[in-house]
């Protein structure tokens, strides 16, 4: 068995087209285009790449992009003041603070300061709580993107055993909630999980989000399982790889996402979908 690819490039392009159509419908109805404010503190090279990709996505979708590039020395108080200013602006629909932040700034404090209806990352406790009670408003981007990929591939999660490896607030926890909302049986694994390979071997659907190159081995994947690789890791030779040993896992899985070309592309597309949703909440 060789797995079929779940192609993030094709699926994200289709989602961007839908977002662009939604933006066009707004402007044709006499409403303004959605606006996304992106705040970058410091000069983390990976963050700069992510921010550039988000700006390109905005241009493709017709969303106005507002960039706030702040020095590494920016105080938490000054960052919170900028968030307050953007919260108050009626012409700004989404606010994104690029993570990670410098060590002297508490990310939880900043995330909680964002108006939940402008929290297009979906990280605010209000939005996480709504997802937990099956009343999602703005959903965390990567898990939402994964669910769109599964739907596009015609993969139903209902009644399936899904194993999520990783318990971060950004991916692992909301991913489990998304799967649970679609009636999967969900197991969350983490660094204290006993006999992790055996837990993973029972999975019909595996979502790997640990940030360790090729952490999930091919022989952990039971025949016919669906493998979703959220990881993006840069190796010493400059090449990118995921959290799954792709070449080995694809010989066991029925479907698998590649890295690059998989979940990462969906994260930007779902961010823009959230920005359109946020604009429609406001007007």
Curated annotation (Swiss-Prot):
Signal sequence segment: none
Pfam families associated with the record: THF_DHG_CYH (PF00763), THF_DHG_CYH_C (PF02882)
A single Gene Ontology CC term: cytosol
EC number: 1.5.1.5, 3.5.4.9
InterPro entries according to UniProt: Aminoacid_DH-like_N_sf (IPR046346), NAD(P)-bd_dom_sf (IPR036291), THF_DH/CycHdrlase (IPR000672), THF_DH/CycHdrlase_cat_dom (IPR020630), THF_DH/CycHdrlase_NAD-bd_dom (IPR020631)
GO molecular function, one term: methenyltetrahydrofolate cyclohydrolase activity
Residues binding NADP(+), per UniProt: 166-168, 191, 232
Recorded catalytic activity of this chain's protein: (6R)-5,10-methylene-5,6,7,8-tetrahydrofolate + NADP(+) = (6R)-5,10-methenyltetrahydrofolate + NADPH; (6R)-5,10-methenyltetrahydrofolate + H2O = (6R)-10-formyltetrahydrofolate + H(+)
Keywords: Amino-acid biosynthesis, Histidine biosynthesis, Hydrolase, Methionine biosynthesis, Multifunctional enzyme, NADP, One-carbon metabolism, Oxidoreductase, Purine biosynthesis
Annotated metabolic or biological route of this protein: One-carbon metabolism; tetrahydrofolate interconversion
Top-level taxon of origin: Bacteria
CDD domains: NAD_bind_m-THF_DH_Cyclohyd
BP-aspect Gene Ontology terms: L-histidine biosynthetic process; methionine biosynthetic process; purine nucleotide biosynthetic process; tetrahydrofolate interconversion
Family: Belongs to the tetrahydrofolate dehydrogenase/cyclohydrolase family.
Subunit structure: Homodimer.
Functional note: Catalyzes the oxidation of 5,10-methylenetetrahydrofolate to 5,10-methenyltetrahydrofolate and then the hydrolysis of 5,10-methenyltetrahydrofolate to 10-formyltetrahydrofolate.
UniProt protein name: Bifunctional protein FolD
Taxonomic source organism: Laribacter hongkongensis (strain HLHK9)
Taxonomic placement: Bacteria, Pseudomonadati, Pseudomonadota, Betaproteobacteria, Neisseriales
Gene: folD
């Amino acid at each position: 068995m060789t797995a079929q690819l779940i192609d993030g490039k094709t699926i994200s392009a289709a989602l961007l087209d839908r977002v662009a159509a939604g933006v066009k419908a707004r402007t044709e109805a006499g409403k303004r285009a959605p606006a996304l404010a992106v705040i970058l503190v410091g000069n983390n090279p990976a963050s700069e790449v992510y921010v550039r990709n988000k700006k390109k996505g905005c241009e493709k979708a017709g969303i106005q992009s507002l960039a706030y590039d702040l020095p590494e020395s920016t105080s938490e108080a000054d960052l919170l003041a900028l968030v307050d200013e953007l919260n108050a602006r009626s012409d700004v629909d989404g606010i994104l603070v690029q993570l990670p932040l410098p060590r002297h700034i508490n990310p939880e404090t900043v995330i909680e300061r964002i108006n939940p209806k402008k929290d297009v990352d979906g990280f605010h406790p209000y939005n996480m709580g709504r997802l937990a009670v099956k009343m999602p408003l703005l959903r965390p981007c990567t898990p939402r993107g994964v669910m769109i990929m599964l739907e596009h591939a015609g993969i139903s999660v209902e009644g399936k055993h899904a194993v999520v490896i990783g318990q971060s607030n950004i991916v692992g926890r909301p991913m489990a909630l998304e799967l649970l909302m679609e009636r999967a049986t969900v197991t969350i694994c983490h660094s204290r999980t006993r006999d992790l390979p055996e837990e993973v071997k029972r999975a019909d659907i595996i979502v790997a989000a640990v940030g360790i190159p090729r952490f999930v081995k091919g022989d952990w994947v039971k025949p016919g399982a669906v493998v979703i690789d959220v990881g993006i890791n840069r190796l010493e030779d400059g090449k990118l790889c995921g959290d799954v040993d792709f070449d080995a896992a694809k010989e066991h899985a029925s479907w698998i996402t590649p890295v690059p070309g998989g979940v990462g592309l969906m994260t930007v597309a779902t961010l823009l979908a959230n920005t359109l949703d946020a604009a429609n909440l406001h007007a």
